[in-house]
């Protein structure tokens, strides 16, 4: 892992290059995704069968997982896993319940009524990855906020394996309250949710992380359906001063690096000795890490340790990066929170490591990546509702303001708008 001693602008340039390298998208992949989406739109289940056999090596007669399979899944998971899942569910619900908002009703003078109605989406699709790792936690993080919002129907898709779907995924789906589960993955699953097929219902919104093909497919169908966000590779920035623990920092950097080779792991520190210790510790921990090949490739391609003169500059650099995850291993981390402008999720102190947020604490782990934390937010209950405004005026109330409306409408050249007001008072031209 490279240790970089640069001024602010040079450090920022290097970091941007790391991110660009992580987000390079082959044009051939984009073309392939576009073709898959179009074929599923046109051929529906026939295309799903073709791509499932091609990409997953599995022939499936019925893509829907039966209720019996879901019930039997609990026989194949550990009691300790169920206990952990229940604890995570409790914390996720308690956190997200506080995000729920009420409809607004505002009654002003002269009988003017204005308001906003908040309603849940009717149905959503949740994508759960099934590649080099299985993610039951993603089921909870995507489904529970939707349930709290009041979504009527939740459909889940996840790639099939030779032996079926990982029972841990099925148990998590059952616990979270998923209504239907389908054995389908990749760009073809996103297309099926967006357009509908003979077997899979069309939904109003698609959420959930996935690989590059899934992310590009979500971009392709956006507008046909809504999506949560277009997630890029996982990323973490750790800011540390001389109080930082090299073992903790190295472990936290590797916790993101093991996701995939395109993940980004960056440490920004004011202490050169700590930087050297972190570098050594990463090498030591990689030797015993089961996913060391993936993590090492990620660290070599997209990892770095930056030396800066002050924590203030470290925070400025982090704000320019706008990372998915930001850890603060510094004295008085709570005092620095006010200076963090852009980050998906912020972890304060040595005992709030990023995996705590990934699995158990309650805040959502579906976060903006690739700098989009500047304008996107973590997944929340708000993502599963829509809002309608309403208003009611009395004749007297409209009469009082009609001249303003007519003036504005005529100024914009929209004379039918003006007439719509005037005709109610016998003033049409």
From Swiss-Prot:
Pathway: Amino-acid biosynthesis; L-histidine biosynthesis; L-histidine from 5-phospho-alpha-D-ribose 1-diphosphate: step 9/9
Note describing how the cofactor binds: Binds 1 zinc ion per subunit.
Residues that bind NAD(+): 127, 188, 211
GO CC term (a single one): cytosol
InterPro entries documented for this protein: Ald_DH/histidinol_DH, Histidinol_DH_CS, Histidinol_DH_monofunct, Hstdl_DH
GO MF annotations, alphabetized: histidinol dehydrogenase activity; NAD binding; zinc ion binding
GO biological process, one term: L-histidine biosynthetic process
Residues engaged in binding Zn(2+): 256, 259, 358, 417
Catalytic activity: L-histidinol + 2 NAD(+) + H2O = L-histidine + 2 NADH + 3 H(+)
Required co-factors: Zn(2+)
E.C. code: 1.1.1.23
Keywords: Amino-acid biosynthesis, Histidine biosynthesis, Metal-binding, NAD, Oxidoreductase, Zinc
Active-site residue list: 324-325
Function: Catalyzes the sequential NAD-dependent oxidations of L-histidinol to L-histidinaldehyde and then to L-histidine.
UniProt record similarity statement: Belongs to the histidinol dehydrogenase family.
Entry protein name: Histidinol dehydrogenase
Biological source species: Bacillus cereus (strain ZK / E33L)
Highest classification ranks of the organism: Bacteria, Bacillati, Bacillota, Bacilli, Bacillales
